[in-house]
């Protein structure tokens, strides 16, 4: 039966099945505990940074994979320790944060020192690419640690879940509207399949989900609508 489907239907089926598996993993990690959520983010961080550095190497750059990934892990650990309500490592969150900050302050100079001995043709490019991986991948994922405690000082998984729902609503509506109604391309040179119709469809889906989140969580509607727009 699958051979009789059009390419669009096959693509939709693959996206649906993979999305369902991803949804189970992500939602399960968020609902299980703060630590499982942190482990999921950390796995995404390491995988994302290694992929980023791999792509950078294909473009002729020479990032410091080990130091860059280590800096990203430490940055994540700093933020997770700061928001965690039951961390006991090194005597508590404040001690863990201080220790991680000291380690982070050592890692950054270490990148510059190591670059002196790597004998690369463009050391500035190597350092810049390494730091870009930290800023582009590790920093956003580290800041996601704060989302479940927005509006309170306790772990509230449903805040994170609805934040994820907003992202998914944007992706799903953008894909469906773009696939069925997409006519005007946004940036054909960079992404030939992205259309303005899909963009506004995704925006509408995100805003609708933001409104639902505000009602379910009994939170500020305008705050969630603003979050959805961003």
Show the residue positions of the predicted features.
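Membrane-embedded alpha-helical bundles of polytopic integral membrane proteins
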Residues: 2-228
